[in-house]
UniProtKB/Swiss-Prot annotation:
Gene3D superfamilies named among the record's database cross-references: Ribosomal protein L33 (2.20.28.120)
Disulphide bonds in the chain: none
Lineage: superkingdom: Bacteria
Listed GO MF terms: structural constituent of ribosome
Protein's organism: Chlorobium luteolum (strain DSM 273 / BCRC 81028 / 2530) (Pelodictyon luteolum)
Protein name: Large ribosomal subunit protein bL33
One Pfam family named in its UniProt record: Ribosomal_L33
Length: 60
């Protein structure tokens, strides 16, 4: 039998550079495997408000 999907959780990624500049932040939601990736996720994603790729960090 197949194992369940209890290891995958939904997370939210928030732009860090827009927060520093005082602009509107962009947010993405994605999933991660909490057994393989125990620390906070940091990805480079597109921010449409700043019109460039910026760092997005995982928030609670």
């Amino acid at each position: 039998m197949a194992k369940g999907k209890e290891n995958r959780i939904v997370i939210t990624l928030e732009c860090t550079e827009a927060k520093k500049e005082g602009k509107t932040v962009s947010r993405y939601s994605t999933t991660k495997n909490k057994k393989n990736t125990t620390d906070r996720l940091v990805l480079k994603k597109y921010n449409p408000n700043l019109q460039r790729h910026t760092l997005h960090k995982e928030i609670k």
